[in-house]
Amino acid sequence: MDISRRSALTAITAGTALTGLAACSGAQSSGPDKKTTSKLPLPDTPSGLLLNKSRAARILDENKVDLLICSQARNVYYLTNQVPMTSRLGMGDYSYAVLSAKRPDRPVFITGRYNLYLGGAADTDVFNEIDFKLFSFPEDPVGYGGLTDIKDIINAPVTDAFYPKQHQDAALPPHIQRKKDRDIKAKQAHFATLEGGLLKQLLDTDFKHKTIAIDDPKIRETIAKTDLDVRIVDGDRLVKKMRLQKSANEIILHRYAARANARSARLAANSIGEGATLQDMRGEFFRGCGEQTMKPVYMLIDSIVPELVPREIKRGRTLMIDCVSEFQGYHGDFGRTVCVGEPSRKMKQVTDGLSYIWDRILPEVKAGKKYSDLHALAAKLYGETNLDTGFAINPHNVGLQHTDEPSRADFGLWMKDDIELQENMILSIDMPLLNNGIGGTAHLEDLVLIGKDGAELLNTSDDRLIIV
């Protein structure tokens, strides 16, 4: 298939009338731009924790939290770099990551020896930055089930039948040997169950503020077995506050995720022709993700997310694409407008208008601004385009989730907050136009890193309108 496309120019003067916007179009080129679609080299694996230690310490202090206990796999990963494999296997969250106000620079990982064997990140120095409490299985399961005293639960005899009989025919692979060494080193902190490890952590904590943050209600059951008089607050919200500002190690992974995700989206957009289906296009995006060791999350095409919708792509109808995939947990989020053949004049005016707005918002994306400031500016700029199609803008922090930001209040349903932009936030400025009867849909979305002096684009921001 011969593929060609046009790029909408974005240098549009302020206050230009709609007819002027529509007149701005780029020169035709053949095939996807190599600089944006060449395969990217994988980044080096960060050697230390992903956790933003200084911010974590500040958040714990500001919220007067003595102990943060997390069991959600995403939060465990953020605090420890460890992937709880039992979660991936559908066996539940059988790990805890614990961060104390006394040692916010040194998380505790309470997990099964089997889980450490399967998923422990032993190929980096991160093992040296974590304290481990490992559990295996009670030596007497029946007797253990009848224990009520927490000291008996903590000190219950443990079976040591974990590793198979060891032979000396060949050396173990280095990463396996490191895991085994860590297991042996942590032997004094072995417990019969996950609960025993957490009870020990609770008894060893000095509760200055009498406050524990948890990200899962089931943790309350273990806390209730102690005689601690403590307040319980929303730990998931607390971790999301920490995650607003990325650490240097997170930024390494996120730079790659943003670029590789955008590359895969562009490849998919340029792969289609008249008669192709949404499934064809989505399959190309997933394939591109695989080439870059990215894990596809979803590709929204023309407001449609379900993968089994087989609809054909028609010439002249613009399609919004919203492409999300992740690398080592960190999400890329990229949106464009695609059309087979020339779009209608109205839709071309829309895509030019989105470019006009984005190019003038970008210089204002800086620390100290709030989401509401960006909304107000976007509304003003929309008025300057003379468009009557309607307009939406959704700035959101991106990280270990597509929308990685704390809710307005503890627990309950998530509610969007008016967040103040901060240095080292990774932000999406999301500007979709959904189906409203004008001949198509449109989208413009890039990821930016907020620095000291403004925002840095993490993916190239060309090809606002992709014509194939």
Residue map of PLM features:
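Active-site neighborhoods and metal-handling regions in enzymes and metal-associated proteins
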Residues: 2-468
